[in-house]
Amino acid sequence: MAPEVASHVERHCTTIRRGPDYLFHLILDSMVDDYAVVVDRVTASLDSLERGVFKDPSPHQLARLLKLKRTVSRLRKTLVLEREVLARLMRGEFELVNEREIAYYRNVYDHLVRYTELIESAREMVSDLMQTHLAAASNRLNHIMKY
């Protein structure tokens, strides 16, 4: 995060003249951009787990689902809190952001909203996969008990 911001400041010396609120925007934007990688990893893990749950609903798959559920829950909590702080900044609750910089903060806010929605979908999918895993395990146990 910091190297990208430092590089931007070095390349565009006018950044400093725009004030600390613009510099803060650059830092926030860089932080929020890093969430894209995390959300992609969560999505990839979900895809892998989905295939595994339908192929072989093992206790290992359930442990991975529980771990991913905790990760998604923590990430969602973080995203929601950051989104709320940004919303308050844009509403002017803190007199830290110059009016002309609000549009930049709104862009960061929009990204946070998008990532929050993706993580919310991931949270629902984890719950669905857990239900599927438990149903498949129950079916397998019923099948074994028949014989």
Language-model regions, residue ranges each:
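Peripheral, non-transmembrane regulatory/ligand-interaction domains of membrane transport proteins
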Residues: 1-100, 104-121, 127
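Membrane-interface, cytosolic juxtamembrane amphipathic helix immediately N-terminal to a transmembrane helix
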Residues: 113, 119-147
